[in-house]
């Protein structure tokens, strides 16, 4: 994105007229170079990754951590592994506090720190991780640019001329002494700000909201008004499913506002923002008529490609817990003309992998992004079983232990990934689940994927329009059991809660067979079900944002592991279904 913005400034100086096509063409060309570079690294991936580690240690030998472990004398991977312990965030919290509050530097990393990023924890104060210019460059080269190269190979040529509905919200806060705090996506949005009006339908007031703005309305309204939309881009596919559902529910208001060039008076935003938005819109009766003609026919068939004939792509995280949203989007909102780009494994802590092809849920690790170690998930924290990338086994599940330019050394990510295949020497991985997102009522170790498959199968079998679900492992009941909370947008007439509950329970027994055995032995109880009020999950998202979380970092709660979440969903049960 930074390269794109710099190109924009250069062209502005030269008096050239920038267009979406020129910007996307430039990004795709640069991305093709980055993709070729990654494929070259794949031939000798282990050597490339070892060289990355040795350079990192030499560059950081004079940091406080580097002196503590004598980075200067480490010459082999084996020495590095013997000298440095496997770490968690608590090992770095003190350094981060000293850096931010005391303005000390050269503690964790010698590289310039651009910003402090928040992680996506569910509650409380998110963990803060420094983001160096080196790591940002890696994200831009291998994540942002490669995605454009893959689009260019897979999509019809017209994609470069169209715009994208951007479902990202940038939030950056200034801390002490000019230091900035936010999330990774905010960095990219800030650096691309100069060209956003050319490539995105979403107005700046929704991408950089003031905290009191109904961004869903702005994303949907401006997106619907644009007939040249070719992409929907989001962090997680849950946001894409949510905005399409919002359009389905509120299309009459949205179309009316587009027709008259107004903003509905009930939409939440400050007068200053309302005035700015009003200055960007004009009545569009012809576009409104096109939209109304589509929506008045109902939603029995997907509407997205009818209102946006040029729509070719939806991109975002769609593996693991987010597969449920891909299914929902494909089932209800788009047809086979729309492709999906599944983002690789990336987080505040670093870039782990990128896909090599459109629609591929496997993604290749990036040897120049971090040094990779892999702990088998079934090793039960026996660190002697840690292996490097050249020793991983296809089909096996691992936790990544990473070392990167942000000052994290042998850091546990607590993510379960599976080695799906290899591209030359590059492992191709796929995210499975968070290691702390496994539930037990006795000793079943039911993974989030089992709960997700249960919910998806139930919706498919009964014709339910599932919005989302959460599961609570109720170990305090007389007999331990799982309690499902489910929100539905549409349900078949005459269906009962007990009918749904019965199917949920049968499906959960299929994906977690221990539950059936517990009931047979008389030590476990059948699954319980509560149906939630409409827009419960939308309310949860808004509440987390109100509590200070960055919108781009709010993830769905599929396994309830704390009292706050349990009380929140319990308070929003639809009482009429409990009778």
Task: List PLM regions with ranges.
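Active-site glycine/GP-rich loop and adjacent strand/helix microenvironment
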Residues: 2-72, 80-84, 95, 102, ...
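Alpha-helical scaffold segments in carbohydrate-active enzymes
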Residues: 142-149, 242, 350
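Short secondary-structure capping/junction motifs at helix and strand boundaries
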Residues: 127-130, 151-163, 253-257, 338-339
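Conserved nucleotide-state-sensing and coupling region of NTP-binding domains
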Residues: 159-175
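Long, hydrophobic, well-ordered secondary-structure blocks that form the structural core
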Residues: 130, 135-142, 340, 346-348
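Conserved adenylation A10 loop of the ANL superfamily
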Residues: 116-130, 243
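Active-site diphosphate/adenylate-binding microenvironment
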Residues: 51-55, 59-116, 128, 134, ...
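Contiguous, well-ordered alpha-helical segments that form the cores/surfaces of helical PPI scaffolds
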Residues: 114-118, 349-352
């Amino acid at each position: 994105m930074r390269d794109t913005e710099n190109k924009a400034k250069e062209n502005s100086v030269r008096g050239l007229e920038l267009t979406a096509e020129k910007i996307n063409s430039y990004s795709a060309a640069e991305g093709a170079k980055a993709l070729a570079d990654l494929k070259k690294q794949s031939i000798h991936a282990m050597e490339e990754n070892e060289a990355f580690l040795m350079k990192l240690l030499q560059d950081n030998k004079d940091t406080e951590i580097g002196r503590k472990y004598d980075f200067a004398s480490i010459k082999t991977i084996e020495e590095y592994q013997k000298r440095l312990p496997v770490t968690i965030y608590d090992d770095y919290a003190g350094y981060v506090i000293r850096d931010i509050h005391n303005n000390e530097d050269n503690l964790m990393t010698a590289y310039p720190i651009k910003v402090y990023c928040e992680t996506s924890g569910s509650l409380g104060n998110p963990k803060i991780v420094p983001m160096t210019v080196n790591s940002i460059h890696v994200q831009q080269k291998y994540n942002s640019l490669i995605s454009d190269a893959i689009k260019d190979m897979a999509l019809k040529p017209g994609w470069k001329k169209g715009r994208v509905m951007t479902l990202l919200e940038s939030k950056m806060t200034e801390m002490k002494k000019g230091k900035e705090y936010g999330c990774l996506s905010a960095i990219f949005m800030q650096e691309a700000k100069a060209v956003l009006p050319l490539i995105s339908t979403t107005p700046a007031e929704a991408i950089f909201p003031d905290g009191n703005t109904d961004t869903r309305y702005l994303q949907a309204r401006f997106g619907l008004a644009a007939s040249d939309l070719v992409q929907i881009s989001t962090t997680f596919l849950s946001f894409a499913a949510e905005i399409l559902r919002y359009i389905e529910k509120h299309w009459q208001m949205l179309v009316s506002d587009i027709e008259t060039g107004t903003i509905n008076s009930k939409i939440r935003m400050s007068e200053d923002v309302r005035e700015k938005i009003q200055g960007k819109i004009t009545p569009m009766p012809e576009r409104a008529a096109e939209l109304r003609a589509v929506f008045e026919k109902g939603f029995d068939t997907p509407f997205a490609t009818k209102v946006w004939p040029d729509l070719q792509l939806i991109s975002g995280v769609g593996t693991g817990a987010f597969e449920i949203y891909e299914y929902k989007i494909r089932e209800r909102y788009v047809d086979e003309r729309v492709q999906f780009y599944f983002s690789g494994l990336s987080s505040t802590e670093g870039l782990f992998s990128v896909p090599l092809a459109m629609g591929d849920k496997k993604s290749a690790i990036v040897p120049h992004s971090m040094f990779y170690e892999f702990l088998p998930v079934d090793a039960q924290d026996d660190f002697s079983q840690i292996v490097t990338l050249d020793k991983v086994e296809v089909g096996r599940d691992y936790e990544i232990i990473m070392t990167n330019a942000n000052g994290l050394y042998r850091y546990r990510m607590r993510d379960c990934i599976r080695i799906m295949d290899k591209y030359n020497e590059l492992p191709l991985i796929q995210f499975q689940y968070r290691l702390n997102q496994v539930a037990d009522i006795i000793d079943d170790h039911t993974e989030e994927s089992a709960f997700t498959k249960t919910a998806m199968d139930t919706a498919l079998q009964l014709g339910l329009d599932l919005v989302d679900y959460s599961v609570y492992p109720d170990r305090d009941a007389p007999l331990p059991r799982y309690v499902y909370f489910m929100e539905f947008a549409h349900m078949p007439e005459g269906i009962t809660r007990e009918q749904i509950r019965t199917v949920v329970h049968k499906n959960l027994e299929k994906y977690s067979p221990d539950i059936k055995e517990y009931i047979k032995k008389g030590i476990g109880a059948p699954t319980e079900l509560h149906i939630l009020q409409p827009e419960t999950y939308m309310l949860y998202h808004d509440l987390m944002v109100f509590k200070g979380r960055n919108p781009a970092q709010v993830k769905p709660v599929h396994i309830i592991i704390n009292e706050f979440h349990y009380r929140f969903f319990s308070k929003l049960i639809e009482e009429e279904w409990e009778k």
